[in-house]
Regions:
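Active-site gating loops and adjacent loop-to-helix segments of metal-dependent hydrolytic enzymes
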Residues: 106-117, 159-191, 234-246, 250, ...
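Active-site core of metal-dependent hydrolases
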Residues: 184-312, 331
């Protein structure tokens, strides 16, 4: 995203303040360090003052007085994931309020996410009422991931695309043709923190709207669209530089009618979102996207819904019945996907095993690419001295499975075991075992109860 160097510096300072940098130095030791490129001869990282102070080539280099975490030879240190498309989780969505948003940010860190865009949507009138309050959370400490701004996914979408590709029987949505005045009103309510906007280019004046977004320093994204290949090209010419959950919410790729997906695959100007959970996009097609775009033009996202973190079972989103299966997808009664509940660490396991993407490239797609796209590439998305100490650590976790009929392959049990945000450890897997694990299970049950069938809600309430 375009922006002045002074703007980047201000954002840098604000983001680092979220890390509460005071405290003793911390050393993380592991078998592999990906910066995201393999760091040959590096065995660990020293974090101090909220940033990466230096890379360590020997365990004896840990300074006196530092907290040392030896995470084992199978552990991999990567830049913290930056998810530009996540709506919520654990029964909550960002517009539910401050406490809800903080809970989502805290829990998202448990899978290795250190920064994200709060993805929201609604009518312009709705958004101007609750965006100011949410904007208070941007770049503030949360005890988890840092909110880096907003991704607006709606109202400027063709909701009929949901019907065309099966996610809903009817959209039930009022259509709002793109209007620059509406955008600036919403951006003012968001205190200038809208970074990414999804829109469908088939609306009247949509191309002019895309030009307006681009000139305002916001990344325009094509999504939830029935656009023809030529219209998709026109949208890119107008300023589109991002594609919302590629292959989903758009015409299926066909060799005689490639649709928007075909244009996204072949235009190097566009960064393509990928939901790599194995359900939204088959691993073979994940590999196709990776080979067509390369690791520098793909951004990994969860598109995590409020049902993220829910166990398998049947739930109700209003009148709509949904099923969470062992692949952690949210499935409708007709067998169509209506969102993902898969965390980013499981997604990475799918991508690097079934999808065949090397870990160093997966780390680039999950951290470096979104950091650069958001104008944060000078201090986030890499593990090098001077950059923010935003680090995710992945290692084999006994019993971790992919589900969804995916094979058990070497690396498919790799999950997040530690997350550091601006030099502060906000999550350690071993700290949630035992009694804390039981307390968390009770918390999760309370969150999911309201979405159960009435008879199940009554039964669980009696327990």
């Amino acid at each position: 995203m375009s922006g002045s160097s002074s703007g980047h510096a201000a954002s840098h300072a604000a983001t680092r303040s979220a890390g509460q940098a005071a405290g003793c130095p911390i050393v993380l030791l592991a078998g592999t360090v990906l910066a995201p490129e393999p760091s040959v001869g590096v065995v660990g990282i020293l974090a101090e003052g909220g940033v990466i102070a230096r890379l360590l080539s020997d365990r004896s280099e840990a300074p006196d007085g530092a907290e040392v975490y030896d995470l084992g030879p199978d552990a991999v240190l990567v830049p913290g994931m930056i998810d530009v498309h996540t709506h919520g989780g654990w029964g909550l969505r960002y517009p539910d309020g401050h406490d809800a948003a903080r809970t989502i940010l805290r829990r998202r860190a448990e899978s290795g996410c250190t920064g994200l865009l709060m993805t929201v949507g609604g009518s312009p009138e709705e958004m101007v009422t609750w965006l100011p309050s949410l904007a208070d959370l941007v770049e503030q400490p949360t005890g988890g991931a840092v909110a880096l701004g907003f991704h607006i996914e709606g109202p400027w979408l063709n909701w009929d695309a949901w019907v065309s590709w099966g996610a809903r029987d009817s959209s039930g949505r009022e259509l709002f043709p793109p209007d620059p005045d509406d955008f600036f009103r919403i951006q003012e309510a968001a205190r200038g923190q809208i970074k990414l906007v999804s829109c469908a280019p088939e609306f009247p004046d949509a191309l002019r709207f895309i030009e307006t977004l681009s000139k305002a320093g916001v990344v325009p994204s094509i999504g939830h669209t029935t656009a023809s290949p030529q219209l998709a090209r026109d949208a890119i010419q107008a300023g589109v530089r991002h594609a919302t959950h590629t292959f989903n919410g758009m015409q299926p790729l066909h060799h005689r009618d490639p649709g928007t997906a075909g244009v996204v695959l072949t235009d190097p100007r566009v960064v393509a979102e990928l939901i790599p959970d194995g359900s939204h996009v088959h691993p073979i097609v994940q590999q196709l996207l990776y080979r067509a775009k390369g690791p520098d033009r793909v951004a990994l996202v969860t598109d995590g819904t409020r049902f993220g973190g829910f166990p398998q079972g049947t739930y109700y989103d209003g009148e709509r019945k949904l099923e969470i299966r062992d692949d952690l997808g949210c499935w409708t009664e007709k067998g169509n996907l209506a969102g993902s509940g898969s965390p980013i660490d499981r997604d990475l396991a799918v991508l690097t095993t079934e999808g065949g993407v090397p870990w160093e490239h997966a780390a680039r797609m999950g951290a470096t690419v979104p950091a650069i796209e958001l104008g944060l590439g000078t201090h986030k998305g890499r593990l090098i001295p001077g950059y923010d100490a935003d680090i995710a650590v992945f290692a084999p976790v006994p019993g971790a499975m992919l589900g969804g009929g995916l094979r058990v392959l070497p690396g498919s049990d790799r999950r997040c075991i530690l997350t550091m945000v601006c030099g502060q450890i906000v999550y350690r897997r071993e700290q949630i075992q035992g009694q804390e694990d039981d307390a968390r299970a009770r918390e999760d049950e309370a969150m999911t109860r309201q979405f159960r069938a009435p008879e199940v809600r009554e039964e669980t309430a009696r327990k």
